[in-house]
Design a protein with these regions (language model features):
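Zinc-dependent metalloendopeptidases
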Residues: 2-325
């Protein structure tokens, strides 16, 4: 889909303690029935159509959260543990998006990808598989794509108008200085490749982008599920909210067991600017990222931005880097 221009910076990986990041959520506890931790999927390996396996109902919830399946309200199939036709089609679409063999079964590779840390924004929304826009989609995935849920994210595919090229961002009270610095660097990186200019504001209420760390059910309709769920999520223009999962471990430097603050910010800012997920694994808009990994902008990310309506083409000139500990 994109021209793969991939250059490597020399990454100097400095080891340090993970940052203790405060949570700025309400005091409400996480609601188990509304959250999806990914570890349960490990116990479903080997599942296939026709089987009844305890936990498949949770998998249906997982796939519905990320846009792969939708059961109408008058159907009970969403609340059972049957591996039905709709679930098989959803698994095939997921496998296709993540460059896996489209078996429709929960093989080891599929389970490994499904349990990987990822962004909480859906891959498919409003009936569109954003990871495959402009590509020929195999017929076995068509039904799943046409039966996806509609989410509050990216409804109508909104973009910031060309007249709004100077935007402000602010942090929830108590956000650490290290986190603020990392997110600011990510905004600067996007500014270097787009027409946007970003500046930090001290007014959290009036800022265009509002960044904070939250736990559990924090009032935005997309509760976090603890340390084994989504890393972060953000909302499309002009909403501007970017929420890190406060139960995850984040750090300024790539250390084992922690997620790189700036890399996660680069991804989520892409959503704030209107970008969807990419099927190019090297792109910052690829939905998942391992711990202790640094990524930068990729040509695919810039191409995606240039293909957005009301945006003047931007020349891609920065280096792209990736570093794993």
């Amino acid at each position: 889909m994109a021209i793969k221009v991939f250059q490597h910076f020399l990454c100097i990986c400095l080891f340090s303690l993970a940052i203790p990041l405060p949570s700025h959520a309400s005091q409400s506890k996480p609601k188990a029935e509304n959250t999806t931790s990914f570890d349960f999927i490990k116990h479903l390996e080997g599942g296939r159509k026709g089987q009844k396996v305890k936990g498949l109902q949770q998998l249906k919830t997982y796939l519905q959260e990320f846009g792969y399946i939708n059961y109408s309200p008058n159907k009970t199939r969403a609340n059972d543990d049957d591996f039905d036709d709709s679930l098989e089609a959803a698994v095939k679409t997921y496998q296709f998006n993540y460059h896996l063999k489209t078996t429709g079964t929960l093989d080891a590779q599929t389970v490994s990808q499904m349990t990987a840390p990822r962004c909480g924004v859906p891959d498919i929304s409003n009936g569109t598989n954003w990871m495959q826009v402009g590509k020929n989609v195999p017929s076995h995935t068509q039904n799943a794509i046409h039966t996806v849920s509609h989410f509050s994210f990216f409804k109508g595919n909104p973009k910031w108008p060309s007249t709004r090229d100077r935007l402000t961002y602010a942090f929830a009270p108590g956000t650490s200085s290290d986190a603020i610095s990392a997110v600011a660097k990510a905004f600067n990186t996007w500014a270097s490749q787009t027409q946007f200019r970003f500046s930090q504001s001290q007014n959290f209420v009036s800022a265009d982008f509002k960044i904070g760390f939250y736990i559990g059910d924090h009032g935005d309709g997309a509760p976090f599920a603890g340390p084994n769920g989504a890393l972060a999520h953000s909302f499309a223009p002009p909403d501007g909210r970017l929420h890190y999962n406060g139960d995850q471990s984040f750090s300024v430097n790539p250390i084992a067991g922690s997620f790189h603050l700036e890399t996660v910010a680069l991804h989520e800012i892409g959503h704030l600017l209107g970008l969807q997920h990419s099927s190019v694994q090297d792109a910052i808009m690829w939905p998942s990222i391992p711990a202790a990994t640094i990524k930068g902008l990729h040509a695919e990310d810039i191409q995606g931005f240039n293909n957005s309506p009301d945006v003047e083409p931007i020349r891609f000139s920065s280096y792209v880097f990736q570093c794993n500990v």
